[in-house]
């Protein structure tokens, strides 16, 4: 496998402090925007906000910096001092530690701090406990306000800090340089800044964490140095402990949270540290192994196998240590993406008033709620994969034979309260007698405590998590019964509620109530087998290989080795460029709008009669035929491209960026990205553990310290081997930049000195920059040397990919969307007897069942029917895409892909296809959906919710999430979206004798089905990705260039459509009414589109709903709705008087139509007129002239 060579680029960064404390008067404008984007619990005065230019930092803010992190002795005798600089970037979050109460809380949920304090000991995690010396020397927010001349009651203080040194502030290893204060302008306001520097400056050559920072007599302090007062602010330290360290501790299974903070800080200060960073006394969760046996961790079971469960615990802590080290490396990286600038956000363009601006931001955040819900409710989400299981040795007879898949992550959320074990497998004191929940098959409910743990026990992040969950659908769209919040609250007035968090007046907004409303979607942990990881990430490039055939005939495959051609010439002959030309011509014909690929362009004005339909279809066919023929001619004759091999190697591919500024402007979204990255790092580290353990005495006390560097190097060697793309940078200081820092002798109130010399500690930076995700286009069978288990898995997939021989319903074929949309124009008389409304379902069902009276058809009708049938049959004969086109864009791209598959002699199996589930937002569809935001609760809850619904413009956050699907991914990915998808990382060696480990990030599935997202369906031939677009919203728009199958309303309705019949519309409506009852009236056109993926039927459903409400005199009645549906069914079931019927089955089969698909070989009907397939047979080029060596298109 070829990999890109490592390239080294020199980047210049300015020297500076490791952070700032910003102090400002509470802004009069922009406060509502800042509140919406921040994470704050209503019972705390602290908050986490995003770093945004124009909102929290000034214009021109430099994201990358060479931070002062210490000092070194230089010169003869070591008498001089120079500064040690470390490249880093500023954290995408800022931490408000004073005045947070001025920001509106993210949710009205009460007592979230109490919930976190209760959950922390329940799961065994340590609480924040400042030392007495810290409290004695606290720098309070009031004191800082007084120094800055700000009113403490109206001031806002927040920390802006580099990514790698957040933990250093948490453990008081920094100080404020009060003499270096300056002023900047944010918006129209003047803001104070106080630089933050490390205490290590005053301890030359000391590159470690200072355990007792308030000891001014520390022996490492330089002679005559004026040691400053360390910066300790209790609210800030606790906020960092909860929002920064807590999530990492949960992800790494480290119950001693303070030790995680110190380990991370140590890795930041000591660039040469390679040994173990996490403490030796780390504990482990007891649980039953996934094989159903007791965990191989108890001492009595212990040493019969290879070290019993000892290796499992060792792999757990060493993988966590390696992941922490890798995260530290990424935190010191220098990235290209600038911080988000609110003045450039497209979503705010044209929004003149603060309310309108806030409403636009609220609508965008509601889009992201769909992705957050998927991460919470998917059982293989990175949020839940917190424990390590052991599959045992790959070869039971040879325990030393390494396996990449022996150790793997499993869901641990539901077993986190189990007893804790020490290194030897003994239960830790204090955990005796605790019940042990099983890894599979537990009965415990997903509760608020679990949600708190997912957020690292941070009330602020938990509040923002609830902000998103309040905007998630509880299952209405898939036919589940959603809890009636009004009734629940009313009934709870006389009963006890187990949460102990809320009162009757606040129950509607309580975290427990929100989880109860979403109960049908709670994750069900029914399997602990090794599988994919559900990750949250961001596409930061407009380029992706997500066309129907992926990266087939891509630039890299066509480029000649001698480099004799220019780039443009090569690009014009790629499959990607051919698809672009097709789409451009379709747009010129006004058939499509590339910006909205699902739209029908101006077809409504173009297709005014049946002749226009013929023209449109023929234009599409001829355009695609021409492009495909030219493409294949260029590939075969011009480049001698191995076109069949190229198809076998083609992949759908995209890259997820690790740049922190590409994530959404929200602390909770940044948490999801961080947890996803930590899960990926641990997966990679776990794959190398067995190789490190092989042949070693793992029980030795010093094994971890000795072999942690070995594991770390192995993980670093995985860079640039197919999955984790890395970048190597040479860091230099900006030209002419003076190194300004506090005087080491004059005190921290003295002005900064600019006479310092300094050097960069990490001159060469090698760090991962993106994750590459792939999905093979063709279904590939097991290789000859695959294991028996792998061959069995492939055999089980074959039936899912096997193309059936059945004839497809015309309306479910390539032209079905046009026939339904324009039926009244094409067949104006195609309506049931006694009806004035043309009905495509009735017409085509009767026609295909040979039940349509011939007298109803004119000659022109028959010619059009022949044209449609011929096209549909010919398309079906070569079709290997298990999706029917829903629009012209899909029709053209699918037809084009099928033509190329025909040239490549593909047969038998469907190819893999991609579907994007695009997150959208809308105002609450019902009063129930707005209950959590009602200004009053208790007995007045329903009235308060109705009042809110009547004045939605006054509530910028009152939006809910929704989804729509799109099967053409390139325009979706061009919007550089935030995404959620399943990721399975394969590891394998290269060529024989090569010990280089390659990886492949395989596009996989989210487990949980409709729990994760209502539009996910179980189809092995499709890969799904949830996407929330960024381009056009928070960044500039670029030019276009498996859970178990769940029977839901969505499947039921699509099954009805697939069965066909004249009464499809009424059957769909009846099934929906019976499933949803009165909630049917709440479904809007977007909901019907999401459920049915059929615009015509969606409009029919809205019409049925309107008629049902009219029949009930404005009130919903199930009887009236069913009556309307049955009347419609009766209308389309009439066939009129008996007489001669039109024989659709035989019609057209006797003619060998010349207008076939470019001479395609496929029998078009029962008459079986054979059509010669030129490429059929053992030797597709056997009839070519023997003397001609080069392959030509004519040979095909």
UniProtKB/Swiss-Prot annotation:
ZnF unnamed span: 499-512
Compartments where located: Host nucleus
Highest taxon of source: Viruses
GO molecular function, one term: single-stranded DNA binding
Region (Disordered): 1176-1196
Alphabetical keyword list: DNA replication, DNA-binding, Host nucleus, Metal-binding, Zinc, Zinc-finger
GO biological process, one term: DNA replication
InterPro entries in UniProt: DBP_sf, Viral_ssDBP_head, Viral_ssDNA-bd
Location (main, coarse): host cell
UniProt motif (Required for filament formation) ranges: 843-844, 1142-1144
Record region (Required for nuclear localization): 1171-1196
SUPFAM superfamilies: Viral ssDNA binding protein
Any Pfam family matching the protein: Viral_DNA_bp
GO CC term (a single one): host cell nucleus
HAMAP family: HSV_DNBI
Function, as annotated: Plays several crucial roles in viral infection. Participates in the opening of the viral DNA origin to initiate replication by interacting with the origin-binding protein. May disrupt loops, hairpins and other secondary structures present on ssDNA to reduce and eliminate pausing of viral DNA polymerase at specific sites during elongation. Promotes viral DNA recombination by performing strand-transfer, characterized by the ability to transfer a DNA strand from a linear duplex to a complementary single-stranded DNA circle. Can also catalyze the renaturation of complementary single strands.
SUBUNIT field: Homooligomers. Forms double-helical filaments necessary for the formation of replication compartments within the host nucleus. Interacts with the origin-binding protein. Interacts with the helicase primase complex; this interaction stimulates primer synthesis activity of the helicase-primase complex. Interacts with the DNA polymerase. Interacts with the alkaline exonuclease; this interaction increases its nuclease processivity.
Family under the similarity heading: Belongs to the herpesviridae major DNA-binding protein family.
Entry protein name: Major DNA-binding protein
Source organism of this protein record: Human herpesvirus 2 (strain HG52)
Gene: DBP
């Amino acid at each position: 496998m070829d990999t890109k060579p490592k390239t080294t680029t020199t980047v210049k960064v300015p020297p500076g402090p490791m952070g700032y404390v910003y102090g400002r008067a509470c802004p009069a404008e922009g406060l509502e925007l800042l509140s919406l984007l921040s994470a704050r619990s209503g019972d705390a005065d602290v908050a986490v906000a995003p770093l945004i230019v124009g909102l929290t930092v000034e214009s021109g803010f430099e994201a990358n910096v060479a931070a002062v992190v210490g000092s070194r002795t230089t010169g003869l005798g070591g008498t001089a001092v120079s500064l040690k600089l470390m490249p880093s970037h500023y954290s995408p979050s800022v931490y408000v530690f004073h005045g947070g109460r001025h920001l509106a809380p993210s949710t009205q949920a009460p007592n979230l701090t109490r919930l976190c304090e209760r959950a922390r000991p329940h799961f065994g995690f340590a609480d924040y406990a400042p030392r007495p010396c810290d409290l004695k020397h606290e720098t309070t927010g009031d004191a800082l306000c007084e120094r800055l001349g700000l009113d403490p009651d109206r001031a806002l203080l927040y920390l802006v800090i580099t990514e790698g040194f957040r933990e250093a502030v948490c453990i008081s290893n920094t100080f404020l340089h009060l003499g270096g204060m300056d002023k900047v302008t944010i918006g129209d306001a003047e803001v104070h800044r106080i630089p933050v520097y490390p205490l290590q400056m005053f301890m030359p050559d000391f590159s470690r964490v200072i355990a007792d920072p308030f000891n001014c007599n520390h022996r490492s302090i330089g002679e005559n140095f004026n040691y400053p007062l360390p910066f300790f602010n209790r609210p800030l330290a606790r906020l960092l402990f909860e929002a920064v360290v807590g999530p990492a501790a949960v992800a790494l299974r480290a119950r001693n949270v303070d030790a995680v903070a110190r380990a991370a800080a140590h890795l930041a200060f000591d660039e040469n540290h390679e040994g173990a960073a996490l403490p030796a006394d780390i504990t482990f969760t007891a649980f039953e192994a996934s094989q159903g046996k007791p965990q191989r961790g108890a001492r009595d079971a212990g040493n019969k196998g290879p070290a019993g469960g000892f290796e499992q615990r060792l792999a757990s802590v060493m993988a966590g240590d390696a992941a922490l080290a890798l995260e530290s490396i990424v935190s010191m990286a220098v990235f290209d993406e600038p911080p988000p600038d609110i003045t450039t956000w497209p979503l705010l363009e044209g929004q003149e008033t603060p309310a309108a601006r806030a409403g636009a931001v609220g609508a965008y955040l509601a889009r992201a709620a769909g992705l957050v819900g998927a991460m919470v409710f998917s059982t293989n989400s990175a949020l839940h994969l917190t424990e390590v299981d052991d599959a045992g040795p790959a070869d039971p007879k040879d325990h030393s034979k390494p396996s990449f898949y022996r150790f793997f992550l499993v869901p641990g959320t539901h077993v986190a309260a189990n007893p804790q074990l020490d290194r030897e497998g003994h239960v830790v004191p204090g955990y005796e007698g605790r019940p042990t929940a099983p890894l599979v098959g537990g009965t415990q409910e997903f509760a608020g405590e679990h949600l708190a743990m997912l957020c690292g026990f941070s009330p602020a992040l938990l509040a923002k998590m609830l902000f998103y969950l309040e905007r998630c659908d509880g299952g209405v769209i898939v036919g589940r019964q959603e809890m009636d919040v009004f009734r629940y609250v009313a009934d709870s007035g006389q009963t006890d509620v187990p949460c102990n968090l809320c009162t009757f007046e606040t129950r509607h907004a309580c975290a427990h109530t929100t989880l109860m409303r979403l109960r049908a979607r709670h994750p069900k942990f029914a399997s602990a087998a090794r599988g994919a990881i559900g990750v949250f990430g961001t596409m930061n490039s407009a380029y992706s290989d997500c066309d129907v055939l992926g990266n087939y005939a891509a630039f890299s495959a066509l480029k000649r080795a001698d480099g004799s051609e220019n780039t443009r010439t090569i690009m014009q002959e790629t499959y990607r460029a051919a698809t672009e030309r097709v789409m451009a011509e379709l747009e010129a014909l006004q058939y499509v709008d590339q910006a909205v690929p699902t739209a029908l362009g101006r077809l409504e004005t173009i297709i005014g009669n049946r002749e226009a339909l013929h023209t449109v279809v023929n234009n599409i066919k001829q355009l695609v035929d021409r492009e495909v023929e030219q493409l294949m001619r260029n590939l075969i004759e011009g480049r001698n491209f191995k076109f069949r091999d190229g198809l076998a190697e083609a992949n759908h591919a995209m890259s997820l960026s690790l740049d922190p500024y590409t994530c959404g402007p929200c602390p909770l979204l940044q948490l999801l990205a961080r947890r996803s990255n930590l899960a990926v790092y641990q997966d990679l580290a776990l794959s190398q553990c067995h190789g490190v353990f092989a042949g070693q005495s793992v029980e030795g006390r010093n094994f971890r310290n000795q072999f942690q560097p070995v594991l770390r190097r192995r993980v670093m060697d995985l860079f640039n081997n197919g999955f984790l793309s890395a970048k190597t940078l040479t860091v230099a200081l900006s030209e002419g930049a003076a190194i300004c820092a506090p005087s080491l002798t004059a005190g921290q109130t003295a002005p900064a000195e600019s006479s310092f010399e300094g050097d960069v500690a990490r001159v060469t930076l090698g760090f991962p920059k993106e994750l590459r995700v792939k999905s093979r286009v063709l279904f590939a069978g097991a290789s000859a040397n695959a294991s028996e288990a792998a061959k069995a898995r492939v055999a089980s997939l074959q039936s899912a990919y096997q193309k059936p021989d059945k004839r497809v319903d015309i309306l479910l074929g390539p032209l079905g969307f046009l026939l339904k949309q324009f039926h009244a124009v094409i067949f104006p008389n195609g309506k049931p007897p006694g009806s004035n409304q043309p009905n495509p379902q009735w017409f085509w069902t009767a026609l295909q069942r040979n039940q349509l009276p011939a007298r109803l058809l004119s000659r022109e009708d028959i010619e059009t029917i022949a044209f449609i049938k011929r096209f549909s049959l010919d398309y079906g004969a070569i079709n290997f895409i298990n999706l029917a086109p829903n629009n012209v864009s899909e029709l053209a791209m699918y037809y084009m892909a099928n033509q190329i598959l025909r040239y490549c002699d593909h047969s038998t199996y469907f190819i893999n296809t991609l579907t994007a589930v695009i997150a959208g937002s809308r105002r609450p569809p019902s009063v129930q959906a707005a209950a959590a935001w009602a200004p009053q609760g208790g007995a007045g809850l329903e009235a308060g919710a109705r009042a809110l619904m009547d004045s939605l413009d006054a509530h910028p956050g009152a939006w809910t999430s929704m989804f729509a699907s799109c099967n053409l991914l390139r325009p979706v990915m061009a919007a550089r979206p935030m995404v959620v998808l399943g990721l399975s990382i394969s590891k394998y060696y290269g060529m024989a004798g090569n010990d280089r480990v390659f990886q492949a990030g395989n596009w996989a599935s989210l487990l949980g089905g409709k729990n994760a997202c209502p539009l996910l369906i179980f189809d092995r031939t499709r890969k799904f990705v949830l996407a929330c677009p960024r381009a056009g919203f928070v960044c500039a728009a670029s030019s276009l260039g498996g859970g178990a199958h769940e029977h839901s309303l969505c499947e039921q309705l699509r099954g009805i459509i697939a069965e066909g019949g004249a009464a499809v519309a009424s059957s769909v409506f009846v099934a929906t009414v019976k499933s949803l009852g009165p909630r049917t009236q709440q479904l809007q056109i977007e909901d019907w589109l999401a459920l049915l993926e059929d615009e015509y039927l969606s409009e029919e459903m809205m019409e049925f709903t309107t008629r049902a409400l009219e029949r009930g005199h404005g009130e919903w009645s199930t009887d009236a709705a069913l009556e309307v549906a049955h009347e419609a069914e009766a209308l389309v079931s009439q066939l009129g008087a008996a007489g001669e019927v039109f024989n659709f089955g035989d019609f057209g089969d006797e003619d060998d139509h010349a207008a076939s698909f470019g001479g395609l070989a496929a029998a078009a009907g029962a008459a079986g007129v054979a059509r010669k397939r030129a490429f059929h047979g053992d030797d597709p080029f056997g009839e070519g002239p023997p003397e001609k060596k080069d392959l030509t298109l004519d040979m095909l």
